UniProtKB/Swiss-Prot annotation:
It holds the Pfam family Com_YlbF. Belongs to the UPF0342 family. Coiled coil: none annotated. This is UPF0342 protein Swol_0655.
Length: 115
């Protein structure tokens, strides 16, 4: 049995994540977008439409080409705003880091279960 306290390590990981460059960039980019209520509103509307689109895809519903085109155009339009484009870049980098960490943990757990 190891003397390692998993909860202490989890807190250590959480601190490391919140001090990481991807996390800090994401927080800063989010603050920049939130300074402008119109940008925040546009971003929330886009997220809502993306969620509806994803839900329809998961349920296997037919999605009209027009809907796909409208969503793509809406994303392209909102991405013209530098602060929002930076937010998307920062969010993508943070999510990638977070997913990588989850994958590392999952692989370690799976290999332990296989032993």
């Amino acid at each position: 049995m190891s003397n390692v306290n998993s909860y202490d390590k989890a807190h250590e990981l959480a601190r490391a994540i919140t001090k990481s460059e991807p996390y800090l960039n994401y927080c800063q980019a989010k603050k920049e977008v939130e300074k402008n209520p119109e940008w925040t509103s546009k971003l929330l509307e886009l997220r809502q439409r993306q969620a509806e689109f994803n839900r329809a895809q998961i349920l296997g519903n037919d999605i009209p080409k027009e809907t796909v085109q409208e969503l793509s155009l809406e994303f392209a339009h909102i991405n013209q705003i530098n602060e929002i484009a930076e937010f998307f870049r920062a969010e993508t980098a943070f999510v990638q880091m977070f997913n990588d960490i989850q994958e590392i943990i999952n692989k370690a757990i799976e290999s332990g279960l296989e032993a």
